[in-house]
Amino acid sequence: MKLDHVIESQQFTVPLLMELFDRTRQMERMVARGGTRDYADKIMASLFYEPSTRTRFSFEAAMYRLGGRVLSTEHARVFSSEIDVERLEDTIRIISSFSDVIVLRPTEEGGARRAARVSRVPVINAGDGSSGQHPTQALLDLYTIYRERRSLDGLTIAIVGELDGGRTARSLAYLLSKFERVKIHFVSPPELQMRPDILAHLDEHDVWYDMLHDVDPIAGDVDVIYQTRIRPDRVSDRAALSRYTINARLLRKMKPDAMILHPLPRTVEIDKDVDDDPRALYFKQAANGLVVRMALLTLLWDRE
């Protein structure tokens, strides 16, 4: 399967995911040796219309580790051309004429797809809109689980937090639907539940799921808790915040080999005391972003 752009999680088949994960292991070994110069002729344009630290730095570090070069901004909206309201499509046409890949975080949902339609080079969606997708985050999330378990079939996972507009949770749910016997618990305040389009997709692919308002009852049953942010000002019942947070009490209920993941940044939803628990893998998860994105870049270029 040819991969021209990375816009949404639905693009990835299981064979393509396994190929990506094999490449990621190769990238781990390559980084341990100090990187490579194999892609020294490549230029990545890092075009962010919204602020980013982890995603932007991860992509740029990936490019440098591959020997390539980076053109970067996280302030595209305030550049002079953008003050004059230059159309996104015009910007992409120009930037794609002197780069080999564009990593794009647009302000609006669907912006990455619009960019891909006019770009001469691969476009990678680095998170579009407040309720769109973040496919490369989901890829590194899935790789982290796969690397620990060696399988994704039969996984039971709780996805917890603000799910109504969580693009990382949305992208991960799409990827999980590709595997056998997966069970997903969506845990959120009633007003922040996962949106119907994701649930319809899971129904269509016969994926088991339920929707809960407390992580406590299923903490001992899950292989993974994928915790996302939970902002107190978005929860109508502040007293109920503990139902969606991870602390020492919840750790005692979890399996000894369970995993705690978080796309970061966190606020109140994971106590800092949890960081030292061996099941807390969110910093390792973030570090995996480097090698997954290295693998993804090579996958795009090597298939050209």
Regions inferred by a protein language model and the residue ranges of each:
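Positively charged, low-complexity intrinsically disordered leader regions
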Residues: 1-57, 61
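Active-site cofactor/substrate anionic-group-binding motifs, chiefly glycine-
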Residues: 43, 48-98
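Rossmann-like adenosine-cofactor binding region
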Residues: 202-280
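A short helix->loop->beta-strand "cap" motif at the edges of active sites that frequently abuts
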Residues: 121, 180-182, 253-259
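C-terminal helix-to-coil terminal segments
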Residues: 276-304
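Anion-binding alpha/beta catalytic cores of soluble intermediary-metabolism enzymes, centered on
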Residues: 84, 93, 100-175, 262
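Glycine-rich phosphate/diphosphate-binding loop of Rossmann-like nucleotide-binding domains
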Residues: 49-62, 147-227
